[in-house]
């Protein structure tokens, strides 16, 4: 009997069979079976994180409809002036101009002014301080100064130093010189060549009335003066002479 129990225990140990209180047995793990077939596809997963932009694609074909015009650009740099064009044809003749004003008040003022000028001219002529010859008027202020001062005085008054261009003008200047009994400078100056005088504007003399033997300053006397008899003499420009201007 004890031998039978021992044998039973050995078999139980070897086979690893265990029984629980519910009267069923749990055996040791068996050999794995063959894999089963694939199941049905699962549901879509959630959207992943947004990736980086991809490279630009190739340029597409031209569109069918033109785009809207762009805004005006900035003004460019002005170009070089072009060549002068040909003279155009004369325009049509304009209508006749209006007649000169016949306003009585203006005419009265004009005549009064003209009368006063004639009166002033006459008074100065009687005093010997102003003489009109042709289109010229010769006048003096009675002062004796050097040549540069005379030239400045005449310029301030709107005239020039008196310079006769014919015998009639020479006689008029001479009469003023005699009136004041003082020699006067003339509007002449000597050039680079000794004895070669010209007018202050640079034009050559078209009339002369030199005293016999004059000019003979040999380049040292750059100005010209008038004697009481109306003849001329070359003289240095620093002497005091009668101021006579022409207008």
UniProtKB/Swiss-Prot annotation:
Residue ranges occupied by any Collagen-like domain in the UniProt entry: 27-99
Residues found modified as 4-hydroxyproline: 29, 32, 35, 41, 53, 56, 62, 66, 69
Glycosylated sites: 20, 206
N-terminal signal peptide: 1-19
Residues that coordinate or bind Ca(2+): 214, 216, 233-234
Miscellaneous comment text of the record: Pulmonary surfactant consists of 90% lipid and 10% protein. There are 4 surfactant-associated proteins: 2 collagenous, carbohydrate-binding glycoproteins (SP-A and SP-D) and 2 small hydrophobic proteins (SP-B and SP-C).
Function statement: In presence of calcium ions, it binds to surfactant phospholipids and contributes to lower the surface tension at the air-liquid interface in the alveoli of the mammalian lung and is essential for normal respiration. Enhances the expression of MYO18A/SP-R210 on alveolar macrophages.
Protein name: Pulmonary surfactant-associated protein A
């Amino acid at each position: 009997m004890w031998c039978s129990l021992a044998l039973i225990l050995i078999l139980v140990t070897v086979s690893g069979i265990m029984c629980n209180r519910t009267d069923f047995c749990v055996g040791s793990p068996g050999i794995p079976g063959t894999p089963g077939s694939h199941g049905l596809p699962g549901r879509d997963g959630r959207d992943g994180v947004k990736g980086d932009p991809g490279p630009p694609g190739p340029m597409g074909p031209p569109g069918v409809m033109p785009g809207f015009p762009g805004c005006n650009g900035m003004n460019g740099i002005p170009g070089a002036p072009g060549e002068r064009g040909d003279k155009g044809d004369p325009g049509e003749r304009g209508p006749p101009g209006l007649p000169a004003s016949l306003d009585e008040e203006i005419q009265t003022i004009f005549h009064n002014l003209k009368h006063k000028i004639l009166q002033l001219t006459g008074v100065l002529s009687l005093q010997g301080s102003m003489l009109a010859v042709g289109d010229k008027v010769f006048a003096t202020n009675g002062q004796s100064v050097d040549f540069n001062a005379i030239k400045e005085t005449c310029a301030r008054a709107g005239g020039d130093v008196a310079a006769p261009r014919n015998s009639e003008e020479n006689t008029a200047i001479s009469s003023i010189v005699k009136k004041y009994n003082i020699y006067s400078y003339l509007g002449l100056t000597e050039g680079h060549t000794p004895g070669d005088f010209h007018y202050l504007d640079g034009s050559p003399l078209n009339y002369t009335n030199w005293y016999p033997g004059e000019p003979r300053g040999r380049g040292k006397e750059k100005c010209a003066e008038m004697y009481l008899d109306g003849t001329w003499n070359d003289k240095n420009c620093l002497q005091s002479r009668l101021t006579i201007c022409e207008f």
